[in-house]
Amino acid sequence: MQTRRKFLLTVAGVAVAVAAPSLVHAAGKLAVSPSQATAITQVLGDGVKLMAVAVAYPYAVSASELNVSDFSVAGRTVSKVFPAKTIGLTPSDSGPYVIVQLAETDANTSLQEDVYEGNPEDAKPQMQGGKPNWVAGQKMKKTIRFNEATASISANGSTLTTSSTHNLIADSFRQAEFSDSKTGKTLKYNFFIPENTQKALPLVLFMHDAGVTSEQTKATLYQGLGAIIWADPAEQAKRPCYVLAPQYDEIIADDDWRTSKYLETTIHLIQKLIREHKIDPKRIYATGQSGGCMTATAMNIKYPNFFAASYLVAGKWSANLVAPMAKNKVWWMASEDDLGAFPSFNAITERLEQQGVKISRAVWNGAWNVDQYRFAYDDLTAERAQMYYTVFEKDSVFRETDSRQGASGHRNTWRIAYSIEPIREWLFSQKKK
């Protein structure tokens, strides 16, 4: 009997069937079947996706033996087939793995699942003014989790089921819990330790949005680029750092400008990590999206000397409360399609300017390429301001397939925001005196 959970996985396109041909050794005499299969997932701007299947063979397969048309994946589009020396998305001329790469544009590839406490109808939040009326510290009856990707692979008349999942970058984070004696809270978190820890390095704190509230420790890693991007090998080669991504199981900030006790617990956790690792206390950076951005703003207000700089994405706060952060280094990012963050950031930056803060502003396009962002960044930062405020112009954060209803403009802001390298550069150029 098919369980509801298995049904959800099936309709979400998680369980896929891969048909592989019989691969023949170069000598043309030995037909062999794959011995093992591994699902490969990757976190993109809109979440973790099943991106490929690595099929292991008992000999080094050469690229000349492979053809895209020889492979098919039920419900998916095969974009590339190539040999590899290790499980991942790095091709090689030959190797013991055949990587069946899948198209990013395929529909229904999300691994996210809603988790309900009791009846799903009872889990709907109370609404006020057309939006959820959440309260800081509140446990949600509807949370999320991310399922493990699986694939059923057919080759030579036999069937293999993936025996493991290789999560690119996300697997390099360690999971732990911190029991805070001062607040009485226990906080789950993900922690990335850089390869070279001989000298003190910066730490980046990323805090997720309310929609990622979950009991699953890794949910914040899988939701988008906010935590993952800093641990990307290419990023670490340029800007090595520690990365802290707490996983909150309750609402951490609300629209009445209250925060959960997790705010203090997170600060206490960072202080603990500084004591235990070679972390530069003058280069602690905060970033967050939506509710995480709100909490980061509240941290800047309550602990104005704690962070070297902050990247605040698609959040809001009361302009009447931001005076204590007037000396801080902040990059604000919102979209004109975000009916909450855009007016709030406008009010906040105007209030800070009244206090003498130099803020440089620009309207950017969410569809720009790497070179366009670089040019716009160079132009804006030439003004050498204390704070920067960039806004994605109307309709520019949406892809052709994106809905424009509800909070889509809000969510699509952070899908793009963390992919802009020059802003990450700016953050790391800041240091407390």
For each feature predicted by the language model, list its residue ranges.
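A domain-start/cap signature at the N-terminus of enzymes
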Residues: 27-52, 75-201
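Active-site machinery of serine-nucleophile hydrolases
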Residues: 210-264
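Gly/Ser-rich "nucleophile elbow"/oxyanion-hole loop immediately N-terminal to the catalytic nucleophile
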Residues: 254-289
